[in-house]
Regions:
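Generic structural "secondary-structure junction" signal
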Residues: 26-29, 34, 40, 89-94, ...
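Secretory-pathway/luminal and periplasmic proteins that interact with or process carbohydrate-rich
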Residues: 56-62, 76, 153-164
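Short, flexible helix-coil linker/hinge segments at the edges of structured domains or between repeats
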Residues: 167-179
Length: 179
């Protein structure tokens, strides 16, 4: 009985050491390492698809309803449970879950776009990236789409969270190209 107990303890110790000695410093199986993400035309196409997937989530639900509530397009009724009351009154804070979700998801989208734009900028720096002229032109189109997506996200955030423009209190832009 004592020998069986010792054998069990030794076997359990060996098994534990065997399991914990595995190499766990690996990238997740469903992710591409950052340095390998944008090195082929396929990588750019997949990143572009990731940017476009943003539109699925950011063009429906609370994202569409919030500005309508802020613009008084919807008015509260007796049984609306004050779900968007803070937005309706323009008294919302960053702790409001709707505001936090909209803010964080748009900035996550901007982060994806910035990663893509940075990757396009590094094409010429990386001698391992070999692209045909047609592929370079296609990536330039994708880059333009990325800039549009970033502008869309900033526009939406400004529409929801910025004050109205007031000429009287606006800063004077000196040496501005756009007059």
């Amino acid at each position: 009985m004592v020998n069986m107990k010792k054998i069990s303890i030794i076997a359990l110790t060996i098994l534990t050491l065997g399991v914990t000695s595995c190499d766990m410093d690996k990238m997740p199986y469903d992710a591409v390492p950052t340095e390998e993400a944008l090195t082929t035309i396929v990588g750019f196409e997949e990143a572009r698809a990731g940017i476009y997937s943003v539109y699925l989530g950011l063009t429906g639900g609370s994202y569409v309803l919030a500005p309508e509530v802020q613009a008084d397009a919807f008015n509260a009724v007796a049984d609306f449970s004050n779900k968007y009351g803070e937005l309706h009154r323009w008294t919302f804070e960053s702790t409001n879950s709707t505001v936090e979700t909209i803010w964080s998801n748009y900035y996550a989208a901007i982060g994806r776009v910035n990663f893509f734009i940075d990757g396009v900028g590094k094409i010429d720096e990386n001698p391992e990236i070999e692209l045909t002229e047609t592929q370079r032109q296609q990536i330039n189109v994708y880059e333009g789409e990325a800039y549009f997506t970033r502008a869309y996200c900033y526009f939406y955030l400004a529409t929801l969270f910025c004050r109205d423009y007031d000429v009287a209190t606006a800063a004077v832009l000196r040496d501005c190209r756009f007059r």
